[in-house]
Each structure stands twice: as C-alpha cells, then as structure tokens.
C-alpha cells in the first residue's frame, strides 16, 4: 500500500504523466469554435484547471513536483494556434471528403445531408471574407456528378431505392439553384482547374508561445486606442464597403424568418451600409430590406404594434426611398421583378432602359397605415399621447399621396393590371383617411400635404388645384375607383362616398346612391371589415335623416343597428364579452384587431338618443291610435322603446331623469298625456344635443316635431268624444298655425288614420260617428282576441303532448271500424256515449290525428 503513494520517481509516474498530456491534447482538439474564440486568459485558466483535475492518487500529494516539471516543459514548448477561419476551412474540407466518399458508393441520402451542412458552413465563412475556392471546386464537381448520374439513370434499368431517389432529387434541385450564385467562379474553375486552385492564398499558421497568449487583449486594446471598429465573430474587423453591400444584404435576406435572428443588429448593419452606399441601386436595395426588417421587428415584439420611434424611422425611410426613385427614374420598384443575382458587380443600365427592382412601395405604405391604426388602438384615447400620436397621420397621408403619384406615373408609362391594382389600392387608402372627416379638416390635411411635396409633382387623377373643393376631390376618387376597380375596393369606395355625403347633410343623394348600389342585398358576401363600414354608413344616413327632420326615415334606417342592442360590435367600437360565450381566443383577437380607433367612433350615446327620440315620435301617436282600434294592437314600431317605456311605467317611484335614456322616456310620458310643452322642455334639456352641429337648429326641429305629434296624439285620443272641433282652438292649444294644422289633419284623413272631414267654411273638423268603436266595444273585441289566443295555445299544447297518437282519438264513424275509446265492441257511439248532434262530424283541425306508434298498436 505504501508503494502506491510514495513511489513518486518510478516509471509509472512518467507514463501516467504522458497519458495525461495525451488526454489534455485530445480535449483541446474537441473544443468548439465558440470556446476557441474566447479570451486567452480564460483558455489558460481552463487548461490549468484541467491539468490539476488530472492529478490523481499520489500525484495530489506530490503536486509541487508536478508543477515544477510542467513549468520546465512550458518554457520549451510552443502551441500551434489556429484561427477561426482555418478551423472552419478544415470543417469544410471534412464535409467535402464525406461527400466524395458518398459519391463513390452512390449514397445520395448522405450527399444530401452533407451538402446542406456544407452550405451552412460556407455561409459563416462568407460573412468574414470571400468564398473559398475549395467550395467552388466541391459544388462544381458535385454538379458534374449529378449530371453524370442523370445520364446513367436514363440508360440503366436498375432503379434507386426510395431514400436514395429522394436524396438524389433533393440534391439535383438544390445544386442547380445554389450554383446560380457562383456561375462566374465555376466557369473559371472549369477552364483551368489547377491554376484556379493555385491562385488561392495559403493561410499562415500563427505560432506563439503559450505565455504570450495572456497579453493578446492588452496589445489589441493598446492598438485600438485611436478609434473604434466593428468586430465580428472570431475577432475579425468587419469592413463595410460599397463592394460588400450586396453580399451583406443577401445574408440578411436569407436569415429572414429564422429563429434567433437579431433584427436590431441587422438594422444597425444596414444603417451603416446606407452611409457607405455609392450608387442609387445600392440605396434602393438597402432601403427595401431595411424597411421590411423594421416591420418584422414589430411583428416579433410582445406589444403587437410598432413603437413610435421605429414607425417614424420607417416613415422617413419610405420617404427617402420614394425621393430616390423620383430622382432616378431608370430604377423602378415593382412586384414580380427578377432579382439581381451577381453580388460582385452592379447592374449596368443603358440610357433609355429601365431596371426593375423587386419590391412594393404600396405594401410599405399600407403596412405603415396599419401600424399607425394598431398603435392608436392600444393607446388610451383620453390621454395627450393619443392626440400626439394622431398628429402622425399627416406624415402618413403625405407618404400615401406621394406613393400614389409614383405608381400613377408608372401606370401612365406602361399600363398593366398589377400597376392599375397598385393605383387602386393607394387611392383606397387615401379615401379611407378622408371619408369620415368634415370638409374643414380635409382641407387642412390636403393643404399641408401639397406644401410638403415638391412643386414639380402633380396628379392626373386628383390635380393639385382640387384640394380646395373637398366634395369634388372625394367624388373624383370614387368615380375613378368605380371605373377601374371591382369587388371589395369598388364596394368600399361606394360606401365611403355615401358616408361622406350623409356626413355633409346630403341625405337624398346618399339614400339614392345606397339604393342604386344594391349593397343591402349582397353585403353578407363581403368581408367583415366591409360589413362594418356598411353598418357605419347606414347609421350615418339615419343621423343625416334625423338632422333633416325626416323622423320616419331616421327611425327606419337606425332600427336595424340600434334595435339589435349590439351597436358596439356592429360598429367595431368595442367588444361585449358574455359570460358563457363560445368565442375562441383567436376569434377574440381578430375582433380586437378590427376595432376602429377612437377618433373614428360614432357617439353611441348620441346614436341611442336619436333612435329613442325618433321612436318616441312614432310610437306615442301609434299607442293613442291603437287604444280605439284593437285590430292595430299588435303593431309595434320599436320593441326597444316599448320595453323601456313599460319598464318605466312599472316603477313605483320615478324621479327626475338622470341620463339621456330617462330624459327621452320622461318626454314620451308627457307627450302621451298631452302636455307637449313639458315634453319639449324635458327633451331639449338633454345635454347631448350640444354635441351635434348647429344644436339650436336641432332643438327647434325637435320642438316643432313635438307640437305636431302632440296634435296627432290628441286627435287619436279624443276623437270619439267630439262631433266637431275648431281648428282655431287646436292652433291655440299647440301653438301651430292654422295652415299647418289643416295640412296635418288632411294628411291623417287621406291616410285613413282619422274618420273625419275638414269643414273649410267653418274652419272646423267634423268627425264621423259609428266608425270608431266605443270603449265597451273595444273591451269586448280585446276579450275575444284573448280568448282566441288562449284556445289556440291550448290546442297547440295538446298537439305537442299527444303527438304520434292520431288514431287513438279518431272520430270516424264508419261501420265495422274500430273506433276510439268506448267504441271497442259493438254499436256506434261517440266519445262519452253521446250521439253526434245533427250527424255532423267535428270540424277539421285541432286533434284529428292520422297515424303514430300508439295508434298502430291500438289497431292491432
């Protein structure tokens, strides 16, 4: 036992030391690229800890001697340090050898896997320098081998197995696409393979003493005191030059959509590339990629909308892109163009020719618009931040108009369906920022936009001088979209024009356009956002009719939206979450995305007030009319108003009105009682009328409507008690002119609402007796109606409970027939034993059944 611990100078000690060195060397070879690129201090400390961990047994007690031996060896030993590039080249060569070995045995599954690995490895190398020539050799030889295999497959009868065939097809497709990027280099290699490979510079191996590695960082810091430089992976300084712009952009584009992509770092790189860009083509390509990356940054954020800072940067870059395209018309950004593949040189554009660059400025401005709306949706509308953010709409509108001028010019040069579609899309975006605004606001918006645009720019669709006439501007845009677009864009343009006309008190034009468009019939075929716009337009027409004093039209138009009780949802102004709703989280998310910003909302309290007021003017006279005409009892114009009125009447104590709804109901009760003055005072005291344009005019219209409907209510209520009634008396009661009262009474007589005649000689109304029912007769008719309703309900209940027992209660009295209950044996008897009166059978209907399971069982 003692020899194991104290035999320190034996051969076994030296052999174990050799083994430890062998293991440590093997561990160093297996270190990854990332660990190799750490600082020299960390590496030296790790090696020392590894050596210490390797001391076992007696070594741990003889540590001083071991350290002494190692220190002596370190003085004489040197370490070969390989750069990250050399290691990656070695990995590349290893992958190429695996591909060559797989080619010998025709293993295409391995070739496919290793080819993908080869491309990933070379992508890291290209980031720091040129493409390795050994990679060009590998892909050129692989393409030749693929072509040879294709020829062999045509001549041989032996087929590949499934995995081999799948790998071969994959490589055949990818090698062709991959080699397009290196066509020039592959041609050079195939012309003279030996000379091509000899031209490659040999990488020097840096040999340093191990102790010198500890001062590498200090030396680097001392040398870099003069300035800063960007350092990439492996400590290599990244240089941004005009020649490397396209390569950097290709790497960034290829990394889009991949996980763990640092988009902020990519944006910084492209901002530096933009500073060194030396040609318009470089600027255009960088801006196209940079704007797309900014929008990708917003997509991946947790807030689900673009920050104000990033939005303004994107807006500025879009403006710069449009300016560059306007200054250099030889470059055209269009969808569907072929991408320039050669990253080594710039495309040469001959005079008079046009180079098409793939991209879409229309999509950029649409996305910018969507991000602003999404941002406004998430900001509290009652804060100063919302007002400040809303001010950015001017910047957005400037870009929309400028992009419109650009695509409009392209469409004039070369007319095509995609370019016409781009014009339609931008025009629609412009219209959607105008249709809901008053003319004064639109005029300010247009003036500021044309001031910011260069003087040389103008539009053939909406010229610069059209900014002063807002109605003509909206009509021109809509007419253009009617002519050159179809489907959703055309329908939305029509709805926007109708909304604009209704907003500016042109009711009859808006109504006629809505009727002629036939959108009411097929609106269900459109998408949800268009249906929301339809609901908003319908509501705006109703509000316009109310402002014009057309009460019946207003109530009829608003009833579809307001009568449902779901105004918030139908107008996209809020979500009503029910306790037991079956809405999935995805559907709820979509609903929230469809919500309109607060500045586009229609005041729901004002909308409800107008709907209830219109219903009051129609329902109160109708209730007075049906009190003497029971056949009209079931006629209800507004169930919502009736329900609120009934609820209020059931209250034991009713205080003064506390809100808009209570004010309208209280006014309706005064009107029904014949006190039109109190009704007018109560209705005009509602403060929400001050939110409308020209509130004094609205209140005067309401007072006149209350006087007229009060007159109608009075005549319906007290007509049975009069023989004649003086028009002068009515004029004094309701503060209306005799001419107006005569007109109202004439209209009631012509519509057969009032059984009377107008005596113009005596200036009186003569009522006809015997037409209207008395109170007793009305009660009798009401009782008869209720009895019939009760009888029908009882019969329906009996049918439901005895369904399927038709023949069990059959009243047929044919001879020999097996009749119902009590007629099983002999004789013809009716139910209960009484013979039928007068030989008449029971009238059809009711309980005469014809079949069923129980009836069949009784027959048997």
Curated annotation (Swiss-Prot):
Gly residues composition-biased segments: 814-830, 848-860
Biased composition (Low complexity): 831-847
UniProt keyword Phosphoprotein, yes or no: no
Major localisation: cytoplasm
GO annotation, biological process: formation of cytoplasmic translation initiation complex
Pfam families noted in UniProt: eIF-3c_N (PF05470), PCI (PF01399)
Alphabetized InterPro entries for the sequence: EIF3C, EIF3C_N_dom, PCI_dom, WH-like_DNA-bd_sf, WH_DNA-bd_sf
Compositionally biased intervals (Acidic residues): 16-53, 67-76
GO MF annotation, one: translation initiation factor binding
Disordered: annotated span: 1-79, 808-860
PCI domain segment(s): 598-772
Disulfide bonds, paired cysteine numbers: none
Localization per Swiss-Prot or TrEMBL: Cytoplasm
A GO cellular component entry from the record: eukaryotic translation initiation factor 3 complex
PROSITE patterns assigned to the protein according to its UniProt record, in alphabetical order: PCI (PS50250)
Record keywords: Cytoplasm, Initiation factor, Protein biosynthesis
General function of this protein: Component of the eukaryotic translation initiation factor 3 (eIF-3) complex, which is involved in protein synthesis of a specialized repertoire of mRNAs and, together with other initiation factors, stimulates binding of mRNA and methionyl-tRNAi to the 40S ribosome. The eIF-3 complex specifically targets and initiates translation of a subset of mRNAs involved in cell proliferation.
Family per record: Belongs to the eIF-3 subunit C family.
Quaternary assembly: Component of the eukaryotic translation initiation factor 3 (eIF-3) complex.
Cross-referenced HAMAP family: eIF3c
PANTHER family: EUKARYOTIC TRANSLATION INITATION FACTOR 3, SUBUNIT 8 EIF3S8 -RELATED, EUKARYOTIC TRANSLATION INITIATION FACTOR 3 SUBUNIT C-RELATED
Protein name stated in the entry: Eukaryotic translation initiation factor 3 subunit C
